């Protein structure tokens, strides 16, 4: 009689280390805009030149067991947040953004919305990387990026003196005027 015994070979994996950053992929459309009130236009106009931001996700394990160093292809549960609110739940953003769901650009957001001058937008990205080696999900969260618009209105200048706004001048106390009078008359 042959007795078979099954033995498990356990492998210990090093933990996954991750690095995340945000990269603007559109040099013609930066995070900041300029609003020209005379022509009623945004520079750049994101309806014409949209802004694309990529969350770059890098992952590695010290033992070399992780092969996907650029981990964007593996991202799951991707969400972009506008001022700490999920962008998918905001009606003011409906149809004004798209999120890439395939390839090395997975997770990249393309924004077609102009930011009003009075509004500041803090944008950040959250997702998970499934680590199949040990069966856990590694959470990913980026730093925030600020989207804002500068008003290009005419500058208003004002000139003032740092002293009393009402200047008082008494010619009788002005000794220079007395000196000029004496020199002119030979006194």
PLM features: residue spans?
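Ser/Thr/Pro/Gly-rich low-complexity disordered regions
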Residues: 1-187
């Amino acid at each position: 009689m042959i007795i078979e015994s099954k033995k498990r070979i356990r492998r210990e994996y090093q933990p996954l280390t991750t690095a995340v950053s945000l990269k603007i992929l559109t040099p013609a459309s930066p995070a900041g805009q300029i609003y020209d009130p005379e022509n009623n236009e945004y520079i750049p106009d994101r309806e014409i030149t949209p802004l694309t931001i990529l969350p770059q996700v890098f992952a590695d394990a010290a033992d070399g067991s992780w092969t996907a160093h650029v981990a964007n292809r593996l991202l799951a549960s991707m969400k972009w947040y506008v001022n700490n609110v999920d962008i998918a739940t905001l009606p003011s953003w409906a149809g004004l953004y798209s999120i890439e769901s395939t390839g090395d650009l997975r997770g990249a957001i393309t924004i077609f919305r102009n930011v009003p001058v009075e509004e500041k937008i803090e944008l950040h990205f959250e997702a998970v990387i499934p680590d199949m080696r040990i069966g856990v999900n590694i959470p990913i969260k980026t730093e925030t990026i600020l989207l804002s618009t500068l008003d290009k209105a005419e500058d208003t200048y004002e000139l003032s003196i740092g002293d009393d706004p009402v200047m008082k001048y008494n010619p009788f106390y002005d000794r220079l005027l007395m000196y000029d009078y004496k020199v002119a008359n030979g006194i």
